[in-house]
Amino acid sequence: MSVRSLAPNSLWNHFADLNAVPRPSKKEERVIEFMMNFGKELGLETTKDSIGNVIIKKPGSLGMEDKKTVILQSHLDMVHQKNGDTTFDFDRQGISMRVNGDWVDADGTTLGADNGIGVATIMATLSSKDIVHPPLEALFTIDEETGMTGAKEMDGSLFSGEILLNLDTEDDDELSIGCAGGIDTNTSYTCQSIATPDNYSFIQINIKGLLGGHSGMDIDSGRGNANKWMARILWNISKKSNLLIGSLDGGGLRNAIPREAKSIIAVPSAELKNVQTELEEQAKVLHGEYKSIEPNIQITFSATESMLEVISEKDTNKILNTLCCVHTGVFRMSPDIAGLVETSSSLARVLVENKEFTTQSLQRSSVESTKDEIAMTIRCSFESMGCNVTQTGDYPGWQPNPNSDILTIMEQLYKDLYNEDPQVKACHAGLECGILGTHLPNADMISFGPNIRAAHSPDEKVQISSVQKFWNFYLETLKAIPSK
């Protein structure tokens, strides 16, 4: 079955069209042009702001002209992740989609349902001649996944909307009314290298098969972090053998839980057998600890070619001690909202290459002061070993408003449609609403969407029946927008 045959047909066809266009963060030129052409071909007012966000405006349908103007918002870029054994060029190829039962996924890559389903929903609305809707201002932002620069640099004066519907939530029974802010911590350290000692052997270690996922939404899942696992394995070996790091490469994207890591280490040849035994033991321990969470763990090692230089013992120990100490995972649960992660940190990227040790991590919190605390904790961990630390991309959270008018409307609509209450939640992720609210201080904002699982990983999938449910709820919401 083809994605294009699914219902609602217009939404899925627009999603297929969108997924044919490469749209990595920071390289959105092609999808911007695609969206500009889309709006102009419909004869709608279509503009691009100074940062690259696309804005398309559509008058209200017959009888809805005097309703409040609604801003429909989703982001154009997508996370590009693929399995290690998948051959795919994100800069040139469109996403290969598959229908598997009640789900749509991709063939070894991220799907782009985050936030492509939201974009396609808005496209279906703009292109429709029979959907009942108020005056609309569609805002398609860029670079949500790697810095939210589209939201940060948007021009609020271009909008008159009083209500903003963000279509970037990933559970169809949730109405999101708040989110976490975040800050990026990047570190660097120039290591001392030495000539590889005589009678040393080299081993390559690979960690693969972890689930990964979104480092906000999935941070409380208990999933493994490949960077922390590698540090743990190497630290344990270093306590029994004179281990020296040749290279280290783990993780990828700043906002994804690392699924894979690899390292090359040098150990005395006379201790090689003992090191191999320790590696087997560490792999066994991790399998035992995570077998109910991580079913596809692969920890392998093999002999590899020698390197002329390695990191000194002193700096090897500094690196391993720091990586083992740095906090990763939930830092604090919310004392006010049951089940909500308030504050967290994720060690997303680790690299030792050409004598340089660098890391990337992302701290999140719905409380500004606690975000400052976790950012300080991470900074101090790396500065204690002498790293240069820069913290950038600080963005605010979105303070929940339980008295929101659009929340009241949508809660009642959901009850009427499904005979149950929606889950009104704040989420532990960086929705653009927190930033958009600084440019649109009078907008009444809410976020919702269909069931999307394993976003930011090659296991990403979106539920077909949930998209239909979300679409019906979305259409009823547009009909229910009050008068000005």
Regions found by a protein language model. Give the residues of each.
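Midchain, well-structured core segments that form catalytic/ion-binding scaffolds
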Residues: D102-D105, E145-T146, K152-R364
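His/Asp/Glu-rich mid-to-C-terminal helical/loop segments that flank catalytic regions of hydrolases
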Residues: S157, R223-K240, S269-L272, K318-C324, ...
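Active-site-adjacent substrate-binding region
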Residues: D218, N225-N227, R232-L248, P400-A443
